[in-house]
Structure formats: C-alpha cells, structure tokens
Amino acid sequence: MNDRMILVVDDETELLEMVRSIFMRAGFTQVLTASSGEAALKVCKEKQPDMVILDVMMPGMDGFATLKELRRISKIPVLMLTARGEAEDKFAGFENGADDYLLKPFLPKELLFRVQAILKRAYPGKDRKVFFDTATVDL
C-alpha cells in the first residue's frame, strides 16, 4: 500500500480513469483527478498532492502554462504524460520544471516505475528500509 497522493490531470475522461485505475491496482490509495489546468492548480492548493501527472494538450490553460504556474507556487514533482513528442515540446517541459516526460501511448508498468523513482528522489526520508538477514526495519 502506498499513501502518497497522486494528482492526474488530463482533459480525456477515459485516460483519467485508466491512469487512476493503474495506480489504485498498484496500491496507491489516494489518486485524485482534474480535467483542466485551472482545476489542477485548485486541487494542488487545497490538497497538496505528493506528485502531479500532467497532460500538455488541454483546452484553456495547457500543461506547459499549468506547470509554469505550479512551479511558481510549489515544488511538487511533475511528470508530463502527453502525445506531444517533438524535441521542442520535451525541452519546454523540462525548462518549465518537469521532473520527467513520458509519451502516450505508454506502458502502465513504465509509468509506475517512473513515478516511483520520482517519489523516491523527491521524498528520500520516507519509505526507507533496512534489511538484516530475514528482518526488515522501517526507518
């Protein structure tokens, strides 16, 4: 079980539900969704999620503008999950503060691995374990 709060932002309802389901099946207990950049910023201010998975192409405030505003107010880790795969798009994501950039379509397992790696780097003091022979100690 993972109690980290993940916010998934995309204007496609089916994709939101699919990504939410992927994380719930993987043991994440708090997976929030937002269908616009504006809604995502509101959720981030109110709920303070541990990580955001953010689409680029959305009506109104796109993912790059959302990321730029999010970086102005927070250091929440962000993974861009988008169909925009041109080098310039990736560079824009990283220049605006994205922690990772993954193209659609994606492999669910790859998304999970990337998110888990980002969370480990962003919150290194949490979820630490020490192994002694057959015993495991949570620090």
Task: Enumerate the predicted regions with their spans.
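Acidic catalytic/metal-coordinating carboxylates
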Residues: 36-39, 62-65, 89
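Two-component/phosphorelay signaling modules centered on CheY-like receiver
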Residues: 13-32
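Receiver (REC) domain active-site loop signature in two-component systems and cognate sites
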Residues: 58
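Short, Lys/Arg-enriched segments at the junction into DNA-binding effector domains
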Residues: 4-5, 117-139
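Short amphipathic alpha-helix used as the core "switch/output" element in two-component signaling
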Residues: 42, 62-75
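Acidic, metal-coordinating helix/loop segments flanking the phosphotransfer/catalytic sites
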Residues: 33-51
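Active-site residues of response regulator receiver
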Residues: 10, 55, 82
